[in-house]
Regions:
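Extreme N-terminal tail/first-helix region
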Residues: 1-18
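Active-site helix/loop of acyl-thioester processing domains in fatty-acid/polyketide metabolism
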Residues: 55-76
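Short beta-strand segments enriched in hydrophobic/aromatic residues
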Residues: 40, 74, 135-137
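Catalytic strand-loop segment that frames the active site of acyl-thioester-processing enzymes
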Residues: 23-52
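Hydrophobic beta-strand-centered segment that forms part of the acyl-chain substrate-binding groove
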Residues: 69-100, 105
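HotDog/MaoC-like acyl-thioester-processing domains
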Residues: 3, 94-96, 100-102, 106-140
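Hydrophobic alpha-helical segments of small multi-pass membrane proteins
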Residues: 56-57, 64, 85-90, 117-119, ...
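A generic structural signal for short beta-strands and their flanking turns/coil linkers
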Residues: 22, 32-34, 82-86, 97, ...
Length: 140
């Protein structure tokens, strides 16, 4: 799918129901690198007393964005990516504001891809969460 990044954006934003429901938008995409943002919605609140984002929503965003970065390395429409492992560290509360995500693939092997994912709100140097994701690549 390296050759058609615009098609990947459409699939990611419009054809994956969970991504569409969350409202994920691709800001930048290149092979192995992705920037995504998610506009804040009231339904994302997990701690209603303090108004913080639900950690599960943040994990879903990290996983989806990391998978998109993995898809940028594939060459055939029949190739597939599956999450095999993910670790997320929550570093600060995510408040009632948009979430921004930057993903960098750190290793692209024949069968395994590894991604570093940073989720932040105002400043990438002050992240709300970081994740390390591993994906299996099923290449045809």
């Amino acid at each position: 799918m390296k050759n058609n990044l615009n098609q990947l954006i459409d699939i990611f934003e419009n054809q994956i129901p969970a991504n569409k429901m969350i409202g994920m938008k691709v800001d930048q995409i290149s092979v192995g690198k992705v920037k995504v943002h998610v506009p804040y919605q009231e339904m994302f609140i997990g701690d209603y007393r303090q108004g913080f984002w639900h950690g599960g929503i943040l994990a879903s965003i990290a996983d989806a964005a990391g998978g998109l970065a993995g898809f940028t390395t594939l060459t055939s429409p029949e190739d597939k990516i599956n999450t095999i492992d993910m670790r997320i560290d929550y570093l600060a509360p995510a408040v009632k504001s948009d979430i921004f995500v930057e993903v960098n693939l750190i290793k692209v092997g024949k069968r395994i891809l590894n991604a570093d994912v940073v989720l932040y709100q105002k400043d990438i140097h002050n992240p709300v969460a970081v994740a390390r994701c591993a994906y299996s690549a099923l290449r045809n």
